[in-house]
Amino acid sequence: MSIQAPPRLLELAGQSLLRDQALSISAMEELPRVLYLPLFMEAFRRRHFQTLTVMVQAWPFTCLPLGSLMKTLHLETLKALLEGLHMLLTQKDRPRRRKLQVLDLRDVDENFWARWPGAWALSCFPETMSKRQTAEDRPRMGEHQPLKVFIDICLKEIPQDECLRYLFQWVYQRRGLVHLCCSKLVNYLTPIKHLRKSLKIIYLNSIQELEIHNMSWPRLIRKLRCYLKEMKTLGKLVFSRCHHSTSDNELEGRLVTKFSSVFLGLEHLQLLKIKLITFFSGHLEQLIRCLQNPLENLELTYGYLLEEDVKCLSQYPSLGYLKHLNLSYVLLFRISLEPLGALLEKIAASLETLILEGCQIHYSQLSAILPGLSRCSQLTTFYFGRNCMSMGALKDLLRHTSGLSKLSLETYPAPEESLNSLVRVNWEIFTPLRAELMCTLREVRQPKRIFIGPTPCPSCGSSLSEELELHLCC
């Protein structure tokens, strides 16, 4: 029979404070730090909103990482906390211990609460407390510095989530006192007018990652360009399935010129992804030459580019240190691949991922990229499936990978000799050819993970048709 340990003095003190909310409110400002986090966690768990409102006003740390405690925003809890912040911001005589500068609604700092395991199971030693205070008690900003509220935002629907809508209204009513900082903003289906309303409230210089899906390029450029220019700390920029409704090449050129000027101010950009690249066909150089910071990741996918577009990729220093290059499903079969080969030679020392899946590259074009590819000594991932390769071309390609010792994942198409009149694999022919290709590869290096022939995606397993099967050859 186990004997339950008696409540600790710390636990009893906290329970007493929470039983009488009026008492806890009057005591908050003098509450020892050793009680603050466990008491806040218990008040949060029990949804003692009045207690939470007051605790926020006397919060003894510079940051309140609420997002890691509240995985999903709860409207009443959010209202209670924001009410406390409002009272804190509007007080003429701020509490003498006031340190709070940041309310973080992102799920980013579980360690903050993990240092205080459980609501009451708190082990506190003087040396650890002093270290904790040193970490938290950074030099305070001036009294008039805006309070920062951090949140990652995903706009999916109208009407907006009620918590997000309430937060937007609360921040808007306190312009100048509060900065709504959004390190990651994703917009899926929200109409552009609602996205603009959100951007007027968000502190634009805080946005580090921006994703925009399913918009018209002309409207996006005309309506959002002025906001993009203010995102000075942007490091990741994604445009996915943005379409264009004009066939006027001259108009497209003018729009691309306007859009490209945005990149002159993006000095921290490291990733640029454009899915459905056709809008920039014939105008890509206007964008590339405006890039100010060397990119690590460039993804231009789905659609077609002209030879002049591919040529410009090797001519600007901003693309000279790429680690990841993705041109999947950009149709390249009608152009010379010498410019792509020149780019591979330029970035050979840094390139780690190369995706040329579904580009419909013909074996007659292959020789243009082999010298550059063979020098990519840091390459770990190479996708080359869904291209038109003969058996001889595939053998040549595999031999040129002999020096790529870091390759850990690679995909290749079935040779055209194994395809029937419907461009489907004849497995009776394909199976021995695949074995022959593996023998060719093992003569020059030992592969780690390789897929030859029609396969699902090695990362997610999805396939484009029922006929596709996974064939892990090694």
Curated annotation (Swiss-Prot):
- Cite the repeat ranges for LRR: 97-124, 179-203, 204-230, 231-265, 266-291, 292-323, 324-342, 348-375, 376-400
- Taking the record's annotation, the residue ranges forming a coiled coil are none
Q: Which UniProt keywords apply?
A: Leucine-rich repeat, Repeat
GO BP annotations of the record are: negative regulation of apoptotic process; negative regulation of cell differentiation; negative regulation of DNA-templated transcription; positive regulation of cell population proliferation; proteasome-mediated ubiquitin-dependent protein catabolic process
InterPro entries per the UniProt record, alphabetical: LRR_dom_sf, PRAME, PRAME_domain
Q: GO: which molecular function terms?
A: ubiquitin-like ligase-substrate adaptor activity
The entry's cellular-component GO terms read: Cul2-RING ubiquitin ligase complex; cytoplasm
- Indicate yes or no for the key word Repeat: yes
Q: Which cysteines are joined by disulfide bonds?
A: none
Q: Does the keyword rRNA-binding apply?
A: no
**What protein family is recorded?**
Belongs to the PRAME family.
Write down what this protein is called. PRAME family member 13
**What lineage does the source organism belong to?**
Eukaryota, Metazoa, Chordata, Craniata, Vertebrata
